Amino acid sequence: MENCSAASTFLTDSLELELGTEWCKPPYFSCAVDNRGGGKHFSGESYLCSGALKRLILNLDPLPTNFEEDTLEIFGIQWVTETALVNSSRELFHLFRQQLYNLETLLQSSCDFGKVSTLHCKADNIRQQCVLFLHYVKVFIFRYLKVQNAESHVPVHPYEALEAQLPSVLIDELHGLLLYIGHLSELPSVNIGAFVNQNQIKLFPPSWHLLHLHLDIHWLVLEILYMLGEKLKQVVYGHQFMNLASDNLTNISLFEEHCETLLCDLISLSLNRYDKVRSSESLMSDQCPCLCIKELWVLLIHLLDHRSKWFVSESFWNWLNKLLKTLLEKSSDRRRSSMPVIQSRDPLGFSWWIITHVASFYKFDRHGVPDEMRKVESNWNFVEELLKKSISVQGVILEEQLRMYLHCCLTLCDFWEPNIAIVTILWEYYSKNLNSSFSISWLPFKGLANTMKSPLSMLEMVKTCCCDKQDQELYKSSSSYTIFLCILAKVVKKAMKSNGPHPWKQVKGRIYSKFHQKRMEELTEVGLQNFFSLFLLLAAVAEVEDVASHVLDLLNFLKPAFVTSQRALIWKGHMAFLLMYAQKNLDIGVLAEKFSCAFREKAKEFLVSKNEEMVQRQTIWTLLSIYIDGVQEVFETSYCLYPSHEKLLNDGFSMLLRACRESELRTVLSFLQAVLARIRSMHQQLCQELQRDNVDLFVQSSLSAKERHLAAVASALWRHFFSFLKSQRMSQVVPFSQLADAAADFTLLAMDMPSTAPSDFQPQPVISIIQLFGWDDIICPQVVARYLSHVLQNSTLCEALSHSGYVSFQALTVRSWIRCVLQMYIKNLSGPDDLLIDKNLEEAVEKEYMKQLVKLTRLLFNLSEVKSIFSKAQVEYLSISEDPKKALVRFFEAVGVTYGNVQTLSDKSAMVTKSLEYLGEVLKYIKPYLGKKVFSAGLQLTYGMMGILVKSWAQIFATSKAQKLLFRIIDCLLLPHAVLQQEKELPAPMLSAIQKSLPLYLQGMCIVCCQSQNPNAYLNQLLGNVIEQYIGRFLPASPYVSDLGQHPVLLALRNTATIPPISSLKKCIVQVIRKSYLEYKGSSPPPRLASILAFILQLFKETNTDIYEVELLLPGILKCLVLVSEPQVKRLATENLQYMVKACQVGSEEEPSSQLTSVFRQFIQDYGMRYYYQVYSILETVATLDQQVVIHLISTLTQSLKDSEQKWGLGRNIAQREAYSKLLSHLGQMGQDEMQRLENDNT
């Protein structure tokens, strides 16, 4: 069958070549022309791409379209095509050698840019003539040479006699030609680069043409000799020459001798390249200086392997091995004198290097096209011997050499069939050197130090070793031991693929046999690292369970002291096997049981260790972190969970959590979050698979079992982790972010798998957890904000809770958000005075918390309840969701507007209840700001927000349900005990906060007083108390009206354009002033009288004065004018008097106000007799403003004069009458008449 197949292939190839002969032309070696075949590795004119090699092997006409004319021109002379070689062979070869000489002569000419074009043309012409001649020889042999019958005694024609001698003549001439041209290695060095002229044509120096002509000659001589043998089917003897053994020269001996010489030349050229290359770059460097030399290697491979297959001759590898063995033995005396002497500084390295490069040439087929599927002849026998020499213990083996050798060996494993013997030879070496680090002093140490950092990195190393394609930088990145592991992996995988488990059993037996108790006890730390690398790789490529079991048995041989010192490494190795089990979806039960028990013991040690024992704690923590990281990888890697996964989550975690400090807790909680995320992801996948249609009972049963396993693992997490989180809600031990994240993950787990939650959380585990971490007022706001952000992000959870009807999910969430905003300047709630103290408000809040608050605000504003409030209030909110404080202000305002728009009593009542639910215990939220430590930013936030709340929700606070909260807000913020102590100064930050927000409170309280469902005397009293306290506290030090513009009480009146009850607020202010600031204690005037008079004056300037206010305040003003002589007081009192009189004129027509007249009448009665001079002076001022007021008082004034004179009993009081007359003089005719009556009165 094989012969039939070969014959079929032969016929197909022959037919293909016969059909494609129109392009045939003499091929030659060329690297000067770009590939024209599109993706070809050799030039289109090459022997490979032109099909010349294939024609030679298939015994076809070398050039079917050439030399078909009767005559041809060679070396400038016309010859008869069919007879030239017979009649003139010696002449033609002489002309050939003459052309060679001419080309060699051109080398002596200087090759500058001006002459290069001429020299290139001459040299190229000579080369083309020479190549054409040799191709003619080939064609002549194929077409015209006749095989003579040597036994025939019939007389022959002289031409036939000459023709019979032609083969021998050719042998002689070819041998002479080879002697003439000598060795390739003896040619002068050639620069492969070319000149490029203006037409982009490459121009080469004569030396380049000479080299390539020599290549052509060497190859074409082999072709001619091969064709001669194929044509004649007999040995052809030369007449003139004998070989080195004194035997007659034949076509076969000349062919073999020339092959040997040519291979020696190619080896010598390669050696020149190798000596210039570093070991680290040897496989990345090109072996051939020129593409044509590479082509010559490929041609020799095909030709020699073809001869060995069909004739009794040696294969290409045998030829090369024979020469390399001579090189390795360093015995030049064995070589013939005609052979070039080859010496190398590193014969072993060179042998590896050239075999590896030459092996890569086998991928090219007869057309020069790479064929990865082509069957490649291996050379393992020689490589095995070479490998034994490379690791011989007789000499010192350098790691840098060994890396290069093994890198070559690994590359050969890619090319050739697997060879178990190679692994065996290498293992014999490495088994004895396991304790070596295999490092190179001048290279950075990248091997085991990085590999053993973690179990995952150990597996990554194994994965890298098992890759089909290795890194070109393997020499620098990996030790020779790692490269050995790559070889081991590649050989075992390829062998098992082709031969089943038998090769693995061979390798396993060899490796296992080297490990026993004594050997295990001899291992150092490095040895143990190499041990784990080896067995992990074996597990990866073969039977993981068998290997893991054997490793556990071997580890039991280690000494206890060594186990203690190297426990971290042993744990890493153990965990690496556990990870491999998970990656291969195997049950981890056997490994998990033992490992988890060891973890529990170490967690217990960690719990009882003292904080002072830092070294011991660090040692134990290293082990625990290996376990934690590894178990996380196991869960993330596992395709599905088995009951054995639950074993990994034992009560060791409960002990560990109690012993951890913050940095350690971060690690454990990160692990928890990763495992929770994995469990939820796997549960969702199971649910999707269960919901598919047409799930058969077997699959359904399997999925149900998987779900039970998941539930068991989830229950373990609840049991060992959640109780700790619950206990740490109010402590600062657990980082806020991780506490919130972990709690949120448990919340989502409870949503997905509610039955796994503890019994005390049933039947609503999600609600129970949210109450603990989201709605509990004692939890730190940083935790609440982050936790609720996670919850609100899950739309499924929000939708379910919003429609559950179990609790007011949205309202309680809004309440927590309000608390988070109000407490943004509080670090934690463990102490009432633990605040963030910072001068800059923006910097006072941690950036991370502010980001979280912004995120929570954005999510909260997407709740349907919140959207509804803003929609009903027609308030825009999207633009301010990035600023939590502004967002809270807008929310308070929106609630107030929404309530104002509600029509029915039932809806109003429900809205009040909901609003109060939003606030919760709002005073508790702000209480930390009101402690002993005074914090400006916190106070500003508190008073500002509460002021907006009081004003915006005034109508809500007017209801009986909400009034109690209003009373508490006022008492807590505006009328605390410290404020009531007049002699005690309030802290400046507190006063500043009150000053900014007081107008809001006053306006809101005023609205409440006006709209209260039940008139409340206490509320009015509160309003009066607030006004009374803060009028005085914010009076300026100097009594100037201009300084009173920003008084908060006046601002409350000024900013109430949209509030109807302004008059009631002003009325209350006036009453407070009358009662508390213009009240004399005996004859002593009230304190800060000038400032209060300035305040009253500013009040009248900014508002419309009512007669009722005049009636209340004017007596006090008049009293100041009478009793106080201080100039400022008199000036301010006079100005107030003027404003009041003018104000009373507005609205009264010709008649003065009766109330105003009444006030002045009482004033005259009270002070007219004793302070008549002051009274008359005051009334003079009034008369200048409004004569009618004083005219209406004439009778009272006259009566007061008479009563005074009568009281004193001294007759007329001349001084008083003069003063009175002066007043009357300002009253026009009525005054004159009264003066006359007084003169006429003799009483």
Curated annotation (Swiss-Prot):
InterPro entries attached to this UniProt entry: MMS22-like, MMS22L_C, MMS22L_N
GO cellular component assignments: cytosol; nuclear replication fork; nucleoplasm; nucleus; site of DNA damage; site of double-strand break
Name of the protein: Protein MMS22-like
Subunit-level organization: Component of the MMS22L-TONSL complex, a complex at least composed of MMS22L and TONSL/NFKBIL2. Interacts with RAD51; interaction is direct.
Main location, first listed in the record: nucleus
UniProt keyword terms in alphabetical order: Chromatin regulator, Chromosome, DNA damage, DNA repair, DNA-binding, Nucleus
Record note on what altering residue 1034 to A does: Abolished interaction with RAD51
Subcellular location: Nucleus; Chromosome
PANTHER family attached to this UniProt entry: PROTEIN MMS22-LIKE
